[in-house]
Amino acid sequence: MALIRTLIDWNAMASQALDQILPEKYRIDGNRYFIDNFAPPYLVPGLCVYDVGGGARPFLNSDVKRALDLTLTGVDIDQGELDRAPTGIYDRTICADIGCFYGAGDANLLICQAVLEHVRDVDGAFASIAGILKPGGRALIFVPSRNALYARLNLLLPQALKKRLLHAVYPKTREGQGFPSYYDQCTPRDFRRLAKKHNLVVEKESFHYTSSYFSFFVPLYVLWRLWILGFHAVAGEQAAETFCMALVKPSLDLC
């Protein structure tokens, strides 16, 4: 097992090195970009914030919450996840399925990071998001795309098998990954359509063309990279592996 682990780690490092020959836009990790660049400008003092699906690992930490005097509500389908969150991070918790939750329209900001791919009814989730936001409120969403090859494989393989494979190849995913995924309507085009349907305006977007799922074997990684380059040339942003969106609920005077 030690030898296999060494080979996997070597292939991962070699795959990362090969990536350096690609233009920068193909090397920016979407989740890291969401954390470091996309979401922070929206964090201003005094907001009522909802973290949807963050559970035990909310987007905000206690220092940021305290410094900005934020009120944080955690919404998750699993009460156990909410209970494992850092003590005092949530001012309130709601155990509910975001696909069928009716909000109070009191949120200035909603953060939903790598959650909607696990929701069976994303149309319902968009309705819930619109209901949680107050007029002028914003939703910040990061999601893997249904069009990604790993997403297609995820949909084909039995849950128990893909969970074992994922955890065997990438042990760090044992915490926080491995939940069932459906990728319902999780594409840039579908998200824009759903936003319009639920009276939300797309304010900002970013599209990302990298992931690490195939980096455990360099030849496979090279083939996947060639696929990404070709797919992007033909389909543009629909070829994104992951993407971020900021959605605004129009103010009452604009409705």
Outline where the language-model segments fall.
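Basic phosphate/pyrophosphate-binding loop/patch that engages nucleotide-derived ligands
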Residues: 131
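Conserved N-terminal segment of class I S-adenosyl-L-methionine
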Residues: 1-105, 109, 240-243, 251-255
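A short beta-strand submotif of the Rossmann-like class I SAM-dependent methyltransferase core
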Residues: 112-115
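Active-site acidic short loop of glycosyltransferases
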Residues: 104-107, 121, 135
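Active-site micro-motifs of SAM-dependent methyltransferase domains
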Residues: 100, 117, 148
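S-adenosyl-L-methionine-dependent methyltransferase catalytic module, highlighting the catalytic core
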Residues: 120-128, 138-252
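Short glycine-centered segments of the SAM/dcSAM-binding site in methyltransferase folds
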Residues: 48, 136-138
